[in-house]
Amino acid sequence: MAVPGLLQGKRALPTGASEKVKIAISQPGYLPWAGFFDLIDQVDQFLLLDDAQFVKQSWDQRNRIKSSTGLQWLTVPVVFRGRLGQPLCEVEIREPQFWQKHLRSIEVNYGKARYFESYFPQLKEILERYGPGEKLIDLNLALIQWLAGELAVKTPMVRASTLGVEGKRSGRLVSMCKLVGATDYLSPRSAIYLLDDLAMFAEAGVKVWFQNYTHPEYEQRFPPFLPYASVLDLLFNKGPESGEILRSGRGQPFTPVQVRATSAECEASI
């Protein structure tokens, strides 16, 4: 079906009634890590949970880059109204030219990286568009669209807020799966709460999988290698090889049974 709010879509979607349609749903953070783009790349359609509850000092507004002393935070200052349930799509940027500090930190730490000049000008152009009164979500989505393009991630992306689907947690996820005709749902590995709601998905005819991703190691500024920085780190260091490197960390998705067993093992070892 045609869905409103399409941000990007160069991959052909399944058209037959019997074909499997795999989707993923996740909040669009600031300058996400490699695993976020791997999740997008594995599915037929990706729903950006832009109206989820905003959490202060979360990945919604910050991420990390590699510096000579380790991983360094870059945080977008926002107007936090403090009310329970403030949706991400309503959060506004607070400070003018906050991006100057971000760009300076990036330039200091990546200025000598092999592919710095290939990506920095476009990054700068995007960041400079946003200031007080602008929405954090618009900044995040602009960066995600650009980064996805550089990584050759072609999955169509849709803002969940445009779907008109209400509900909470798993119930809303199931409703969105049904709306777009999904047969399979690929979840971030961290969303283990879904293990308690598998029956809801099964009743809707949706099979649940969990992402299996091991951060790939590559030549990085300021050894030793540190994983889980923004995907900018990969692009600045490896350039056109970045997409292939990103996908090299992908494993066969976990089943709920495998995730439950792994979680039980972790709890037993504590």
Located regions from the model:
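Residues lining hydrophobic/aromatic ligand-binding pockets adjacent to catalytic sites
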Residues: 3-270
